[in-house]
């Protein structure tokens, strides 16, 4: 009764909805898998935000008394206006970061300023050596400045920094054998929960301080006293920079994890909407097939 072409055409029409249904079912499985994955990630980011918030609260409390160390140590340099002579060539740059990531551009901002400083000093004919406090700063700079690395320190940022940690770093620098004339410490200075600023503070060697012209206004300064002051001053500045950097890092991580959690919520909402639309399309197609089949039987 029917031609061969008609039968083939009918078979093709009958098979096509099945392929569409299989494709939609596969899409639903993919969406379900993605939703589950994103929800798990969101749980992690929310937990990390809570941990960072607790660490930030402690770091901010400890930062206020630590700032006294920094301002006190810089007072002599500012009052006496100590500067290294232009003919002094050896310069030391200390970059303060940590071993942990997921905190925005905290580490890259310090690395960027260090690169700019190294380039400027090298162009001026200075001999520049780098000290990295934290694995992150070493990971960023070591590939391009490996020949300028004097020493690096790890296990930074896992626990709140103490003055003992700063003293160990200062002692290691003084015993490194590199007799620098002047230098700088580059770190992130905490401003508020949502902002920080990359700062640079000066440091000077014992010889530079002792031979500075402005030091003549101070009478009867014993050499041992001046040496003790210079060593203590270096530890103070490192401690201050560690505290500022830690507070900035925890606040940045808290903000980054909060943004990640919000982005995950947006993705979950969009995927849920897509899932519902796809499921509704599958149900509609199945109903059409049932109705069409029932109508054909009638």
Curated annotation (Swiss-Prot):
Modified sites of kind N6-acetyllysine: 39, 55, 115, 138, 154, 197
Q: Which UniProt keywords are given for this protein, alphabetically ordered?
A: Acetylation, ATP synthesis, CF(1), Hydrogen ion transport, Ion transport, Membrane, Mitochondrion, Mitochondrion inner membrane, Phosphoprotein, Transit peptide, Transport
Q: Provide the protein's localization.
A: Mitochondrion inner membrane
Xref: CDD domains: F1-ATPase_gamma (cd12151)
Report the SUPFAM superfamilies cross-referenced here. Answer: ATP synthase (F1-ATPase), gamma subunit (SSF52943)
Q: Mark the residues carrying the PTM N6-succinyllysine.
A: 49, 115, 154, 270
Question: Is Membrane one of the keywords UniProt gives this record?
Answer: yes
Transit peptide feature, positions: 1-25
The UniProt GO MF terms for this protein read: proton-transporting ATP synthase activity, rotational mechanism
- Pfam families membership: ATP-synt
Q: How does it sit in the membrane?
A: Peripheral membrane protein
Q: GO CC terms on record?
A: mitochondrial inner membrane; mitochondrion; myelin sheath; proton-transporting ATP synthase complex
Q: Name one GO biological process term.
A: proton motive force-driven mitochondrial ATP synthesis
Q: Which residues carry this modification: Phosphoserine?
A: 146
Give the family this protein belongs to, as stated in its UniProt record. Answer: Belongs to the ATPase gamma chain family.
Q: What job does the chain carry out?
A: Subunit gamma, of the mitochondrial membrane ATP synthase complex (F(1)F(0) ATP synthase or Complex V) that produces ATP from ADP in the presence of a proton gradient across the membrane which is generated by electron transport complexes of the respiratory chain. ATP synthase complex consist of a soluble F(1) head domain - the catalytic core - and a membrane F(1) domain - the membrane proton channel. These two domains are linked by a central stalk rotating inside the F(1) region and a stationary peripheral stalk.
For this protein, the record's PANTHER family field holds:
ATP SYNTHASE GAMMA CHAIN, ATP SYNTHASE SUBUNIT GAMMA, MITOCHONDRIAL
Query: Oligomeric state and partners?
Result: Component of the ATP synthase complex composed at least of ATP5F1A/subunit alpha, ATP5F1B/subunit beta, ATP5MC1/subunit c (homooctomer), MT-ATP6/subunit a, MT-ATP8/subunit 8, ATP5ME/subunit e, ATP5MF/subunit f, ATP5MG/subunit g, ATP5MK/subunit k, ATP5MJ/subunit j, ATP5F1C/subunit gamma, ATP5F1D/subunit delta, ATP5F1E/subunit epsilon, ATP5PF/subunit F6, ATP5PB/subunit b, ATP5PD/subunit d, ATP5PO/subunit OSCP.
Q: What name does UniProt use for this protein?
A: ATP synthase F(1) complex subunit gamma, mitochondrial
User: Which species is this UniProt entry from?
Assistant: Mus musculus (Mouse)
The organism's taxonomy opens as:
Eukaryota, Metazoa, Chordata, Craniata, Vertebrata
Task: Point out the gene that encodes the protein.
Answer: Atp5f1c
